[in-house]
Amino acid sequence: MARIAGVNIPDNKHTVISLTYIYGVGRTTAQNICAATGVNPAAKIKDLSDEQIDQLRNEVAKHTTEGDLRREINMNIKRLMDLGCYRGLRHRRGLPVRGQRTKTNARTRKGPRKPIRK
């Protein structure tokens, strides 16, 4: 197994699919990385040379991935909550942020039902 951006990449899968195991790299980004490095997206990781894997490592390092991306997302949410804006309040209360209805739906975001006290 090759190790790119601190993630073990499966050897027996195509390069594009293997790169998506990295948090922050989806199909489109993986295809762009393959195009930038000149690596065949259909080639399996085990068939690539060490030089090609190093090129992939360097190209992935140019993107914000894994821990840095998680930290950036959490800091953005924390900033919204500290500002006290509407989106921050919704995050703080654990409700949907993007305008979805909450009268009947949003069970995942709101959590399990709480019994009504009489």
Curated annotation (Swiss-Prot):
- TM segment ranges: none
Per the database entry, which stretches of residues form a coiled coil?
none
Keyword tRNA-binding among UniProt keywords: yes
One GO MF term: structural constituent of ribosome
Keywords assigned by UniProt, alphabetized: Ribonucleoprotein, Ribosomal protein, RNA-binding, rRNA-binding, tRNA-binding
Q: Where is this region: Disordered?
A: 93-118
> What superkingdom does the record give?
Bacteria
The subunit structure is:
Part of the 30S ribosomal subunit. Forms a loose heterodimer with protein S19. Forms two bridges to the 50S subunit in the 70S ribosome.
- Biological function: Located at the top of the head of the 30S subunit, it contacts several helices of the 16S rRNA. In the 70S ribosome it contacts the 23S rRNA (bridge B1a) and protein L5 of the 50S subunit (bridge B1b), connecting the 2 subunits; these bridges are implicated in subunit movement. Contacts the tRNAs in the A and P-sites.
PANTHER family for the chain? 30S RIBOSOMAL PROTEIN S13/40S RIBOSOMAL PROTEIN S18 (PTHR10871), SMALL RIBOSOMAL SUBUNIT PROTEIN US13M (PTHR10871:SF1)
Question: What protein is this chain from?
Answer: Small ribosomal subunit protein uS13
Give me the gene this protein comes from.
Answer: rpsM
